[in-house]
Amino acid sequence: MTQLTVKALSEEIGTPVDRLIEQLADAGMKKAGSDQVTDSEKQTLLTHLKKEHGDTSGETEPTRLTLQRKTRSTLSVAAGGGKSKDVQVEVRKKRTYVKRSTIEDEAKREAEEVANREAEEKAQRDAEEQAKRDAAEKAQREAEAKVTREADAKREAEEKAQRAQAEKAKKDMNSKNADANAQAKKEADELKARQEQEATRKAEAEAAKLVEEARKLAEENQERWSEEEKKKKEQEKSADYHVTTSTYAREAEDAADKKDEKAPRRRKKKPAPATQPGNNRGGRNQRGRGGKGKLAKPTSMQQGFDKSATVAKSDVAIGETIVVSELASKMSVKATEVIKVMMKMGAMATINQVIDQETAQLVAEEMGHKVILRKENELEEAVLADRDSDAIAEGRAPVVTIMGHVDHGKTSTLDYIRKAHVASGEAGGITQHIGAYHVDTDNGMITFLDTPGHAAFTAMRARGAQATDIVVLVVAADDGVMPQTIEAIQHAKAAGVPLIVAVNKIDKEGANPDNVKNELAQYDVIPEEWGGENIFVHISAKQGTNIDGLLESILLQSEVLELTAVKEGMASGVVVESRLDKGRGPVATVLVQSGTLNKGDIVLCGQEYGRVRAMRDENGKDIETAGPSIPVEILGLSGVPASGDEATVVRDERKAREVANYRQGKFRDVKLARQQKAKLENMFANMTAGEVAELNVVLKADVQGSVEAIADSLLKLSTDEVKVNIVGSGVGGITETDATLAAASNAIILGFNVRADATARNTVQNENLDLRYYSIIYQLIDEVKQAMGGMLAPEFRQEIIGLAQVRDVFKSPKLGAIAGCIVTEGTIKRSNPIRVLRENVVIYEGELESLRRFKDDVQEVKNGYECGVGVKNYNDVRVGDQIEVFEIVEVKRTLD
């Protein structure tokens, strides 16, 4: 009879030991894990289990079922000699199925026990935390009461001491005033007398000093004049009267002069026939006095001109850049001469290379020409500088732009302000003709810009026209922060304009202004009551609630900014919008920023110009003049200017036309230059010397969590040399607003699990922006990190590749000292730089002139071989020296 222990039986049937012991106890048998179990006890346990599960049939059902399967197949395998053989393959599979009812019951019971324990522990923790909170609140209240009592007592003591001290000081002051007045009068009289004596003494000393200096100057001038006269006479005596610069011609001239001095003076004879005009042989047959057949020696080798020719010096006008060939043409010399001079000065250039103004100036002055420096925009600067500058700046009205999400009450706010504050008397109400208007309040005037969306605001900022002083952000109290609200915040921060938040619709059910504050705080818009810098005003545009408070907040912010402008003189401003009217031609809305714009003035607007033929205000009325912060509509320009262009009044219409034509010609160059911006591949070229490189990024993702994670990771990549600047971020697809913001900020666009719409793609293509899509955050971080690494300056490192020991020194007639060496480490290469070491001290650094092995020139010699080494421009090589060969390796820098 086979007997098993309880533990062995549990392992055989796949049931935990504790569970099996409980089942045996339920069947009436108390057993431990090491007790024996007989066959009869097994049968008793089986019968009990069947009754417990409702099975009284007595038949044994298996709890485990094992299936075995065999599969045979034939595999053809290549053998040697191009033949193949068949291999029998047998696959055996075995699978066991177990009944899970017992295990599931056990797991269910254990889960219930765990849940009960967790509930008890949670209740206990909650009770402990509540007790701690009650104790902390009680202690805090007691501490606050104690601090309040101490502060009151201290304040009362200080007030009492101050009153006593003030009474004492008043008594002392009354007694000292009389003595102080008499003493002060006496000291003033003494000081006045001393000052008069000191002034007299200084005047006498100054006069004596001037007389002495005049005497010394006269003596010095007399000595200098006598010395200059003496030097002049000596130079005339020793002057060299050669008429040529050639060495041989000078020697011949000196010999002829000596011969003429030795010859006796004779009567001048008739000139020889050879000098007559008809004799072309010029004295070839002229016989000398010495005898027949001898030619007469020439009296001198003097050339046929009396003085040397000099290059004509001229004035050379040089712009900001100039081509080498053009510079040579202006100096009337060959381009090769200019290149030679530049090579002597240490600058290599080609005939078609463009050089800067400073280099061209040095070259021209080196060649003896006078340089006139010119600027390309010299005419433009001269025209804009010819203005009235004597006027004094005065305070001006603020220019306000109202922005916000759609249906948040921006239009209603504007309408209510117009109805309440624009001067009455207009028949049929007020009609807005242009996109800007101004209102008069009790505390001052305010100018509003009605910009459709954020595109116009971004375009004006991209052209550098900061026309807006304050941005009012309208947020609905029931909707909260929306996508266009976030975009408005980003634009205001990028422009550096203060932000005033107008919380609208506070009279509506469900309005929650505190929720708006909490949402805006996530975008660094903090209310003043929370310690921030932004003013929050609760309004209702429909009921007109607190509109006056909004206007007062705007005027208060303008007083803090201290906005000033020149009211008199020639006007300047910015183009808010422009259009082409069918009956009136080009029409431009101009916001005057300084000066006074008059009807008939000549205006220069970007690439357009013209005389102001008519001016209208926002109500459509004709006006004659407009001061600062006043929007007007002008007619008479040559074309339609772009929004954001600067409008300036000039004196001369002809010069205005020239400047406009120059700007039109330069527009193409500017457009081509803009195509190279915001490229990850060209970021290193956009760096300027001595500045920190910035990588501007516009980030869009599918969820807010991804935006925060990616933005935090990108900002952590910033270093001292390269900085990541996130100019815009948000949730959702890439829109046209994002593309316009990237174009204005020179940024790249990164999309994480989002795509750009059709209008955004057109803007990206037209502006030639860099748009990239990602679905894995690590790929995005790695590519940005690689781009930032490419913006880092490279590092160079020296690596020693070989070392040779000098065994002997030989002399060569061509190369000088030749060192017989043996290579002890690495490899000696001919083209690499070397150092000569003596007792491990560097005594020379240069390059190899010769490397030979057995009289053959070689390129390299490896370790253990002998060779002959000739060091260029160095002959002091001694036995025992070491020749170290190294190479300069460029190390690519990374952000790691």
UniProtKB/Swiss-Prot annotation:
Record key words, sorted: Cytoplasm, GTP-binding, Initiation factor, Nucleotide-binding, Protein biosynthesis
GO molecular function: GTP binding; GTPase activity; guanosine tetraphosphate binding; translation initiation factor activity
Pfam families in UniProt: EF-G_D2, GTP_EFTU, GTP_EFTU_D2, IF-2, IF2_assoc, IF2_N
Keyword match Nucleotide-binding: yes
Region (G1): 404-411
Keyword Cytoplasm: yes
Annotated stretches, region: Disordered: 49-310
Chain ranges of the tr-type G domain: 395-564
CDD domains assigned: IF2_eIF5B, IF2_mtIF2_II, mtIF2_IVc
G4 as annotated region, ranges: 504-507
Residues that, per the record, bind GTP: 404-411, 450-454, 504-507
Family note: Belongs to the TRAFAC class translation factor GTPase superfamily. Classic translation factor GTPase family. IF-2 subfamily.
Function (record text): One of the essential components for the initiation of protein synthesis. Protects formylmethionyl-tRNA from spontaneous hydrolysis and promotes its binding to the 30S ribosomal subunits. Also involved in the hydrolysis of GTP during the formation of the 70S ribosomal complex.
PANTHER family, alphabetized: TR-TYPE G DOMAIN-CONTAINING PROTEIN (PTHR43381:SF5), TRANSLATION INITIATION FACTOR IF-2-RELATED (PTHR43381)
Name of this chain's protein: Translation initiation factor IF-2
UniProt organism field: Vibrio atlanticus (strain LGP32) (Vibrio splendidus (strain Mel32))
